[in-house]
Amino acid sequence: MKKTLAALIVTAFAASAANAAVVYDNEGTKVELNGSLRLIMEKADKKVYNAANQSTKKANSALRNAGSRFGITVKHNLDNDFYALGRLEFRFDDTTSRDKFGRLYAKRAYVGLGSKATGDITFGRQLTIADDLSQAVDYEYGFIPKSEYIPTAGTGVVRYDYKGIEGLQLSANYNFGQTNDEKGNPLKPGIKNAYAVGALYTVGDLDARLAYGHTNFETGASYAHRLDGVLASLGYKFGDFTLTGDFGYGHEKLDDAKVNKFYVAPGFAYQVVPASKVYGNYLYERAKGESDKVKTHGFLLGADYKLHKQVV
């Protein structure tokens, strides 16, 4: 089955910078409040073609929330270069309404212990290293399907990060069982457990990233459902011009059924003037089972303008 998605999206996106305001700083304890208001006005026309080359057209327009959030970060210095840290972040998009401003919910909530020499370990509702495994400029649209290969977040995650070498970040995480997302919506299928390891490396104009993850899903039966995924991302700057490439490979097994899938997503970004850039991305994804094959094509073109140092 071949699935082609052609979309024209005209948007106006406004986001205030997530600047932090220090509300307390005394005796080794620092408390910061931060947040941003993110609104998007969009008009979208979309065509989906099926295997018989028949198209279905949908149109949509909205002025909506695009991930507005606020949070509090706490850090307390301990003895011997160690420190305790924690973060609580709230968002508003727990709703089915078109404006996406709904009930407040906790998107992130974690605590941990860290040291510059040995790294940080954190526990709770947080991102995993897989969230950093893309460099495409796609803002709100989540163009790169990396979360379908390795979970990019979880409600019960233990994560370790080491940044003791300049330009290098090493990370590992373990996800405990999860049957609902941060909003309380059921995951289908639920996650029994998962783990991932990854590395981010920057030197000069080169940005290279790599991660591997293994996920076991809930089945409610004696057979297993698991997914092994590899993500990679490369970026290189040529002055004001940046080329990126995001890649993913996954091998999924449900009982005796197997699916192999991959995606390739080249992209670019050009800083036309200090306040504005243009960008574009292309996505090709293929999933092949024992009796069927699904191909997906997608593209995204955009431009942004920085009206103020705190408004894009």
Give a label for each model feature.
Residues M1-A21:
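Gram-negative bacterial Sec-dependent N-terminal signal peptides
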